[in-house]
Curated annotation (Swiss-Prot):
It comes from Mus musculus. One of its GO terms (biological process) is protein phosphorylation. Its EC number is 2.7.11.1. This is Serine/threonine-protein kinase NIM1. SMART domains: S_TKc (SM00220). Residues 74-325 form the Protein kinase domain.
Length: 436
């Protein structure tokens, strides 16, 4: 497939007031659904037309919109998480019944710097095509709020799993770490630095499959380019973030991977302190110990990644071919796919999965005319949202997103490391980006 990156792969306009605002019903309920006519009323409405009509006329649906229980084509359920400047709620897409995660931001609290971070988050997610990276489906804007509609990972955070069940076994750690490594490699190959890699930002979709999410601190950085803002969670921060005025983004992500691996195999953090000042001192001194139960190959890998000097750290390719990871399969990036459905109406030569997506859209009542009228709206369109959800569903069904198979012990049989209990109820909060 040919990649068509929304906004040319660059940053979205950072001024919220210049983003195209829309009502939940897409321009007074008529832009996408069309005006009612006698002919329309005589035939059975398509699911798309019925939903669009209900959003204008059905008392229950209108009340849900008024009470904030519905936004666009999504019914909003309970809260499933919170971020630095947002809350995350579970949503149900009314046409496809797909569960989604909706990140909600209050526009009145978005200063210029936060708007830039949000723009980068959207841009980063749309440039990446990997089975272990959370997908962005749609951006919905109202007068007071912004909603990022994303893939839902219902298995919870890696942090929560380890905090409640204890450390992972080394075979399980290898399986999970291989997926994270592959995702981060894909980011770096696309010049994207995550800057907030941690167990709280790794999400389970099944017992053996994880996805990296929360690109709120991500940025585009060319090879060797120096950055000068502190982003992320202090326990995962590389020493150069405390020591130097500039840093190379790739090395900072690599360090965070080392901290993450340590946490996975031990159930504790390598650097622990009661205050940020003491934590900084510990990281700069490089003082940490690895428990004896950790195998020697894993021990050497952790030591090789957590090197104080950035250029002496193991690179991601070396980590992936390291003796501890030997024999572990790595997921591969997906072929770049179209982020906008316009190609479905422009050519008769479509691939099998594209034909299936188009057929499903037509079954829902989304026609070539709707798709043509949708051009230029990118992620800020319910048509695009439906398309991306269906495309992702087709790719999952065709095993383009395969789930690793591994026999794991039940949680009650696992070694519940006592040290992990200190993390129960505690989250590592990411700090706002600030100039070093």
């Amino acid at each position: 497939m040919t990649a068509v990156f929304v906004n040319g792969g660059g940053l979205v306009n950072t001024h919220c007031d210049r983003w195209e605002r829309r009502d939940s019903v897409e321009s007074s309920c008529q832009t996408e659904g069309g005006k009612d006519s006698e002919e329309d009323q005589q035939r059975q409405l398509t699911p798309f037309e019925k939903l669009t009509q209900d959003m204008c006329q059905d008392e229950k649906v209108v009340r849900e919109i008024t009470l904030g229980k519905r936004i666009g084509f999504y019914r909003i359920r309970g809260e499933i998480g919170s971020g630095n400047f947002s809350q995350v709620k579970l949503g149900i897409h009314s046409l496809t019944k797909e569960k989604v995660a909706i990140k909600i931001l209050d526009k009145t609290k978005l200063d210029q710097k936060t708007q830039r971070l949000l723009s980068r988050e959207i841009s980063s997610m749309e440039k990446l095509h990997h089975p272990n990276i959370v997908r962005l489906y749609e951006v919905v804007e109202t007068l007071s709020k912004l909603h990022l509609v994303m893939e839902y990972a219902g298995g919870g955070e890696l942090f929560g799993k380890i905090s409640t069940e204890g450390k992972l076994s080394e075979p399980e750690s290898k399986l999970i770490f291989s997926q994270i490594l592959s995702a981060v490699k894909h980011m770096h190959e696309n010049q994207i630095i995550h800057r907030d890699l941690k167990a709280e930002n790794v999400f389970y979709t099944s017992r053996t499959c994880v996805k990296v999410g929360d690109f709120g601190f991500s940025t585009v950085s060319k090879k060797g380019e120096m950055l000068n803002t502190f982003c992320g969670s202090p326990p995962y921060a590389a020493p150069e973030l405390f020591r130097d005025q500039h840093y190379v983004g790739v090395y900072v992500d690599i360090w965070a991977l080392g901290v993450l691996l340590y946490f996975m195999v031990t159930g504790t953090m390598p650097f622990r302190a009661e205050t940020v000042a003491k934590l900084k001192k510990s990281i700069l001194e490089g003082t940490y110990t690895i428990p004896q139960h950790v195998s020697e190959p894993c021990h050497r890998l952790i030591r090789g990644v957590l090197q104080p000097t950035p250029t002496e750290r193991y690179g991601i390719n070396y980590i992936m071919s390291n003796e501890w990871m030997r024999g572990v399969p790595y997921p591969t990036p997906l072929e770049p796919f179209q982020l906008d459905p316009k190609h479905l109406s422009e050519t008769s030569t479509l691939k099998e999965e594209e034909n299936e997506v188009k057929s499903t859209l037509e079954h829902l009542g989304i026609t070539d005319e709707h798709i043509r009228n949708n051009q230029g709206r990118d992620a800020r369109s319910s048509i695009t949202g439906v398309y991306r959800i269906i495309l992702h569903r087709v790719q999952r069904r065709k095993a383009l997103e395969s789930v690793p198979i591994m026999i794991l012990p039940e949680p009650k049989e696992r070694d519940l490391k006592k040290g992990s209990r200190i993390y129960r109820g505690i989250r590592h909060t990411s700090k706002f980006c600030s100039i070093l």
